[in-house]
Regions:
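Nucleotide/phosphate-binding catalytic cleft detector across ATP-hydrolyzing
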Residues: 1-33, 52-67, 87-184
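Long, charge-rich alpha-helical interaction segments
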Residues: 70, 74-78
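Short beta-strand scaffold segments in enzyme catalytic cores
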Residues: 43-47
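Active-site-proximal alpha-helical scaffolds that flank and shape metal-associated catalytic sites
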Residues: 36-40
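Short, basic interhelical loop/turn and adjoining N-cap
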Residues: 80-83
């Protein structure tokens, strides 16, 4: 308390959101690919052409999983006059089911399916075409796609490793240190 501290930042490396989760495998990405990092508050989108990230075509949509949670809460109140706990919704989004009345499940599923349809509509706005490219989904929103829509498993890849981003940053940091000759 009352002590001023001064720091010097020696260097900063910046990467597009979601990139670290696929960095160790990006060289395997042949042809056109799209990366969608669907987090709690945003969906970050990046095109990757033959393993090369297209930094000029990165987009952020304020359309994360929390918006789906809010829509479920709203529809549950409108249709059933029920104030549903967000923990129930979170478990439902992760597993595809919940221990609630069937009428409630129908509302929750319908709302989530509409949300997932909107994810794909927004991806198409950024030139996603499943016939021309593969889609790689990272982040918590991948479970929504996995649980609430049909998709071509040969063209859409969902990385549900919750540590993928941290592992990717470790991989990238190691690459950078090695390229600088610091092999510690």
């Amino acid at each position: 308390k009352g002590v001023d501290y001064h720091i010097t930042i020696a260097g900063v490396d910046i990467f597009p959101q979601g990139y670290s989760a696929i960095a160790s495998r990006v060289s395997e990405f042949s042809g056109m690919n799209m990366l969608a990092d669907i987090g709690n508050g945003t969906m970050n989108i990046m095109n990757i052409n033959n393993g090369n990230p297209d930094i000029q075509n990165c987009f952020t949509e304020k359309f994360g999983t929390h918006q789906c949670t809010l829509k479920i809460k709203e529809n549950m109140m409108k249709k059933h006059h029920a104030n549903i706990d967000e923990n129930i919704i979170t478990d439902f989004l992760c597993t595809g089911t919940a221990d609630v009345l069937e009428d409630y499940l129908v509302t929750m599923r319908g709302t989530t399916k509409e949300y997932v349809s909107e994810i794909f509509r927004r991806l198409r706005e950024h030139n996603y075409n499943p016939n021309l490219m593969k889609l790689h989904i990272v982040g918590g929103g991948g479970c929504l796609v996995k649980n609430f829509t049909d998709f071509d498993k040969n063209r859409v890849y969902i990385n549900d490793d919750i540590c993928a981003t941290a592992k990717g940053y470790e991989y990238l940091a190691d690459l950078i240190l090695r390229s600088r000759g610091d092999n510690k």
